[in-house]
Amino acid sequence: MQAIYRSWDEAVFSDYLTRLAVPADKKFKDFSRGMKMKLAIAVALSHSPRLLVLDEATGGLDPIVRDEILDIFNDFTRDESHSVLISSHIVSDLEKICDYIAFLHRGRLMFVEEKDLLYENYALVNMTKTQLSGMPKGSVLGSRENSYGAEVLMLRSDIPAGMVPERTTIEDIMLYMAREER
């Protein structure tokens, strides 16, 4: 790899191989998808990068290995000059390591927001179908009707007095916004 990367650090690479339990005596063609991903991450981190661009970096990995890799990314970003741009369908991974989250749905950017502000600004509200039909246009960001009424995603600032907001998750926000787009 020294021929490819000017700042290649063999010692760092060796440390990552050990930390990620990548076998040195196995041929690459015999690696599982997870082992190939761990090797790719070790390579990516072993040449003094400032930015990692990762597509489904933890996909196909068991939860223990995923958590270990997320810890490595957290360690990497402790240096203020380092960043990670990660694309993932595993929302819990994003919740663990991201400061900002962008949500793309069918080629449309639905939001880019600081993670903590997503929790602070959005809420789910249970209401009747009649209450839902009377909500001002634009205040309902997404809804799911059921036999009891409706569960509605709203900005906390748009929730009418007397209605009780419930904490939402980032996955809920994404699902409700995507549902409203249909």
Language-model features, listed with the residues they occupy:
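Catalytic Walker B motif of ABC-type/P-loop ATPase nucleotide-binding domains
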Residues: 52-56
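ABC-family P-loop ATPase nucleotide-binding domains
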Residues: 1-39
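Helix N-cap at the start of a conserved alpha-helix in ABC-type nucleotide-binding domains
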Residues: 63-65
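C-terminal coupling/interaction segments
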Residues: 140-182
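Short loop immediately C-terminal to the Walker-B catalytic DE motif
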Residues: 58-59, 91
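ABC ATPase "signature
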Residues: 112-113
